[in-house]
């Protein structure tokens, strides 16, 4: 068996299958590696065994070696423990970003090198290119599937060793290729959500690790009690579903939206205005930012930003602060910018990097703050 030059992360899905097929067609010495990132909890919802069988079938059809690695312990320590801690603190984390940084482009890359591969490849909808001595992360050609948002924590070493073979494809073309070459996964449904939750109810899953803690749901305008909640950590800013608020006397029969939460007092705040003033913000402060190039383009610059996946680009001004965080000022007010989620910055199709959102200047968030405002500290 020859030593592979490229190790493809085969997930058992159609995207990684086509990625592997394209590399074989290009004459690369390829092998496939299936990662198990979540230990079987008996629910059967992750379909890991089915995915593994599909990955084996794809590798067999392509005539490439198949490898398996169990990274469930690394995933638990590097991703899931942080996931739980963030929810317990009332924030809304993004485990996919951490999974890419801590598992797929760390432990998978290490395993590939141990097996003799020089580079890794994945089925992400993104592109990587070299400009001079610098590696750039670009959005995928299919903007509706672009996954650069989840890859913004990668650095130069990782990009230099990574291929994204399907980054130039539209999803419809990828499906056609998979069907035309008879890949076993050509008709397989795309996976959605977080693997360790699968098709299960999110609240039920989270409740296994964070016990219910009922409290009041209040109107921030007058403090009136609207209903009760099972735990503030089950909800995120802007959420409509799952509140289970029935008819409220004196209120119109309209949907309610989460506009804030106070973990210390165990209170959830709601409003019937989808674009409620209580959760509109013009500025955010981040945690320490990560720059794909190794450093920011300038101490102060203009670019576009996304504060959630698939959000339209929002023009903004970025100020890099002395502690490594960034202050972002948007050209227009933003709805439901959520602490714990990822801020990702772009210059056209080039992903500059990003950071975890630490705070915003939304009126309700500022009112509930018990520590000095990070924006007042900057002004001082």
Curated annotation (Swiss-Prot):
Ranges for region Interaction with target base in tRNA: 94-96
Its job: Catalyzes the 2-thiolation of uridine at the wobble position (U34) of tRNA, leading to the formation of s(2)U34.
Gene Ontology CC, one term: cytoplasm
Region (Interaction with tRNA): 145-147, 308-309
Gene expressing this chain: mnmA
Keyword Nucleotide-binding: yes
Enzyme category, top tier: transferase
Matching CDD domains: MnmA_TRMU-like
Record field: catalytic activity: S-sulfanyl-L-cysteinyl-[protein] + uridine(34) in tRNA + AH2 + ATP = 2-thiouridine(34) in tRNA + L-cysteinyl-[protein] + A + AMP + diphosphate + H(+)
Protein name listed in UniProt: tRNA-specific 2-thiouridylase MnmA
SUPFAM superfamilies linked to this entry: Adenine nucleotide alpha hydrolases-like (SSF52402)
Gene Ontology biological-process annotations: tRNA wobble position uridine thiolation
SS bond partners: 99-195
